[in-house]
Each structure stands twice: as structure tokens, then as C-alpha cells.
Amino acid sequence: MDKSEFRGTRLKSARLFRGMTLTGLSSATGISKQSISLYENDKNKPEFDNIQKISNALMFPTEFFLQKDSCKTSTEVTYFRSLASATKMDRTSQSIKLEYVAKIYEILSNYIDFPSLNLPTVDFTDSLSDSFEVNNELLCNEIESISSTLRNYWDIGDGPIGNLQFILEKNGIIVTGFDTNENAIDAFSQHTVLNNGDVFFISVDQGKKPEGRIRFDLSHELGHILIHPWSESLDLIDKDEFKLREKQANMFASTFLLPKSSFGKEVQAYPTSLQYYEMLKKKWKVSIQAMIYRSYQLNIITNNQFQYLMRQVSKKGWRQKEPGDKPYFLNANIFQGAIELLIEEKIVSSEGLMRLFRKYGITMFPKDIEDLLSLKKGILSSKTELTPIIQLKRYQEKNEAL
């Protein structure tokens, strides 16, 4: 059994989890920045009262800093959408949060048979090209073919996709969402190596954007998973290549959600009518602006028509909020289903799950884990009802008086 001792790596992990700098933590605790740096690098051991100050500032249980990290995962690459406007701390914080999601996934996989990753093998030549100048038509045709291949592989036809989150999870891609507290990050995907193989996670910034944009974000990240390399750090690629990959992922999302074979035919009826796009939005669950761009991409409308429609969108104030838009939250995800199953089958209680997580070093407050996994509020903090330990005696004589 590992003894309890302060571990600097755990302090750094908790600090970055909260998106806090050394200076910020120093200000919140009254401990010097130099001392905190020494703590994180295990070059000095803090007094217990300082651990308590750190615990309160970072909102982590004191026990967290005295534990060994028993659940090891290896994160390969994280693709962030809107990377250019996100700070390094934004990206690091969200990446660490998703690492904890991966650890919890691995713990639960000891009890739950999660779907295996189910993706076709595709050849995407442009992703391996040394040239960043891409012929749009050729690129679009290639990605159109890949999205069609995936739809056929998953047997979802060429019509509107219903519950995209369910389809992703059914095919082994884990979806979660939490508040990034920043508009700089729309969504991100992460490749993690676990004991039971490779797993891809997608996280979206929910509760701010409408359903159409969330679905586009999910499809965008799916594009990264399917067509882009995951064996290199994004810090090593230049801005031009990153922009190209973002463009390719956007194009994949567009072709995947709005296939040429079906949407392309339907939109031709009234391709310059905003009222018609408003109707199509209810069916395809994609934003009006994305559908207009797709029509232009398919040469159904001219550049002049595209520009005119977008000016009309701006004039109506639809750039930021289209008709029918309201903040969208993910449906109950695979983690919610897994935890409900364990509790309903009396495999483990809510309190038992928290003990299990602590056993593997995931010592957090229930609310943090609920937020990480997009769970119903309170599912991990409900108390197990105690079984009565006393009861009335059964009297032999029915009429015996007290």
C-alpha cells in the first residue's frame, strides 16, 4: 500500500485543471510563487497548513495532494477548434480535464462493456501533402467520398442524422461537454491510449450554442479523428498547416451532415430563399448559414447569390442568433448510462463509486466529476439510505397490552 505523502505533480495537475497560473495561486493562498514552484517540482514539502490553503484555493480535497496517481493514461494529441484565439492555459486546462475523463472511463470499463472504436480505414492524400495550396474542388470531392464511406459504414443512409451524439458513442467515440468559461474554444478531440486500446474523446462547449452549431462541432472533430494524423504534436506544425486541417475538418462536417446526394437535391427547389432554408433547418438540424455555404460549395448558387444571402442574414441579425436557436445541452451520454446501470443493478452505490474513484487517485468533489462527465446534477452526491437496524418484536398473544 502506498503511503500518504505530498506529491508535487498532483498540485500542478490540480492548478492547471483550474486554469490557474503560479501567480494566481500565490495570490489566492498567500504562498510565494517560488515556494509553489518548489512544491510542484518536489524540491520542497509544504507544511500541512499550506496544503489546506492550496486545497481551499483549488477546490480539491486535501487527500488529493497526498495520493499517488494510480490510473495511468497516455494522451497522444489534442485537436482544439479555434486554436488561434485560445491561450495555452485554456488548452492545457481542458486537455487535463479530458485526461481525467479518460481515467474515469478506464475505471468504469472494468465493469461496463463500452462499444469498441468502429471506424473505416480511409486514404486521405491531402492530409499527407507537403503543399498547403489545395484545389478546393478536388479536396471537396475527396472529402465528400470519405463522408459517404463513413455513412455507409455506419449504415445511417444519406438523410438527416438524428441523434449524432448517440451514433458517435455507439461507434466507440466518447462524447462529453463542459463549460470552458472561454469563447476561445468551441470543441476539441483527444486521442488517449488506455490499457484496453486507443480511445477518442470529443468535448464540446455546451449550454451556450444552439443544436446546429453543436452538431457541426461534433462533426468537425469527427473529421479530425477520421482523416488527420494523431501521431504528432500540434505544437510542431505551423499555422498554415493547422489552418488547412481546420478547413478540411469543416469541409468534412459540411459534407457529412449535408450530403450531396440528398441535401444537394432538396435545396435546389428554392436555393435563394431564406424562408426555405429556415424550413430545411428544422429537418437537417444544421444552421442556415452552414446550409447556404454548402449550397455554394455544391455550385447550386453563384458567388453573387451567396454574398447576397449572407448580407440578408446579417441584415436580419441572424449572424449570432438564427430563428429557433436556443442554448443546447448534450443528451444523457454514455457515462450517465453506465453509472445509472451500475447503481440500478446494485453493483455499486453513488458513495461506492466515489470510493472507487478515490482508490485510483480521482479524489475530487462529486460536482467536479459530474461536470466532467456531463452527468445529472447530484447523481454522485446522493446518500445511500440506511437500512433500519431495529424493529418491533412480534408478540405471541395478539391482545397483549403494553
Task: Name every feature range the model reports, one short phrase each.
Residues 1-402:
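Active-site hotspot residues in diverse enzymes, especially metal/ion-binding acidic/histidine motifs
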